Amino acid sequence: TILLESGTDVAFSATKQNGGVIHPGYDPHPGTLKAKLNPPGARMYPRLSKELGFKILHTGTLVVAYSDQDLKKVDELMDNARINGVEKVERLDFEQLHNREPHISDKALGALLANTTVMVDPFEVAIAFMENAMQNGVELGLCQKVRKIEKRAEEDFVVYTQDRQYETRFIVNAAGVHADDVAAMA
């Protein structure tokens, strides 16, 4: 098993620029794949941080409402959270919000508080996952940009990079912002 990385290191592209907020899942529209996968994925991070040795900050998230329209949006997000199975989400009124955050603007009317939001260093997380994969037998091919994927037999593929080719039965496309381009090659 090999992981092909187009950059000079893992997390070389979009990952290193990610903000590192692990969203608990109140944003995705219920019924979507993201709504199904986001909450359980987010709940995995405390365990993964212990197992793989990366730092995690339990920050929580406030979505603050400054208008009646914003309050409606907060209520929609609360509904999403309930339907999507997000735990420890609260609707704060004016008084609760200002008691929690005394320096917030008096124009703030209320908020959604998601207590399970955590933050990570995306580069550190990517390195931890790659180190774990390598400890479990995965090779890392750096500077290996996929140029072409050819389907050979019923279950075989050949993946071409700029200077090598790899024969495989399975391809896991984790190309980030370039995932659509790689998928179109298969």
Regions found by a protein language model. Name each.
Residues 5, 58, 93-94, 142-144, ...:
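Short loop/edge segments at beta-strand edges and connector loops
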Residues 15-16, 76, 183-186:
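Short amphipathic alpha-helical segments
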Residues 1-17:
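Glycine-rich FAD pyrophosphate-binding loop
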Residues 7-9, 97, 129:
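Short beta-to-alpha linker loops that shape the active-site pocket of alpha/beta-hydrolase fold enzymes
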Residues 111-170, 174-181:
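Helical element adjacent to the flavin cofactor pocket in flavoenzyme catalytic cores
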Residues 1-2, 179-186:
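Short, intrinsically disordered, charge-balanced linker/junction segments flanking boundaries
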Residues 20-100, 109:
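Dinucleotide-binding Rossmann-like beta1-alpha1 core, especially the glycine-rich loop
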Residues 1, 88-89, 171:
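Hydrophobic anchor at the start of a short beta-strand
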